[in-house]
Structure formats: structure tokens, C-alpha cells
Amino acid sequence: MEHWIVIYGGSESTKTLVCCNIYLNRIFSTSQYGNSADNVLYHTHYSSARPYYCYWNYSLFKFHYSCFKRGYSFGNIYKHWSAHGNLKGPCTYNSSLLKPRVLKHSAPPQVFWWGRRDLNPGLRRPRPGG
């Protein structure tokens, strides 16, 4: 099963990555797990067998690219993630930690695969349940 991660939020100063499990309606953030993007992704994934979504700021691409490039614990789990789109899920609107918004990109990074820009239209699939 492919796991899509829609990422468009976070903090540049704290390198925060926020993940939303839309089935559990629970927010996971790096501040909960030692400010480690690796840790929060681990906990978010294993909290449920269902898909989830994360939020990431495009300006932080270099930081998150370095995290995913290591891939020692997520190489087989996080195959694809998208930095484009409008996430609709309970966490998006019910959490005080996150204000939903769509970033304006200077470049069109529609889909990322292992940190690599990939504009193959075949990779742009709708989110599960939506």
C-alpha cells in the first residue's frame, strides 16, 4: 500500500513536522517525540494501520529532504509524498496546532518521491477515502 503524505506546514525555527492521523483524529508533532522528524513519522505510522497525512512547509524542503534521504527507518514505508493540494480531514480543522493553508510555490513540486521531484501524472492519486 502506498502511503501519501501531504505536507504543507511546520516551523522553520524548530524544524517542526506535524502529522495528522485522519482516522484517529489525532495530531502528532515533533515536539512530542524529541523534536525528531523520524520519531514523529514512526509514531504516526504505527498508531494505526490506516493512512495519515503530514504537514510540511515548502521552504523547509532541504531539511526534510535530508531526513527522508537517510531512509534508514522509512525507506520501505514512505515511498511517496505530495507537496501540493488541499488536505481535508478532521485534524485539519479541529486542531489548534495547525492552521490549514495552501502554500504558493515558486516552483511546481506537485509530487515528491524520495525527495526527488517527480511530475509524473500517474503518481497523483486521490487520497484514500476521498
Swiss-Prot record:
This is Putative uncharacterized protein PH1631.
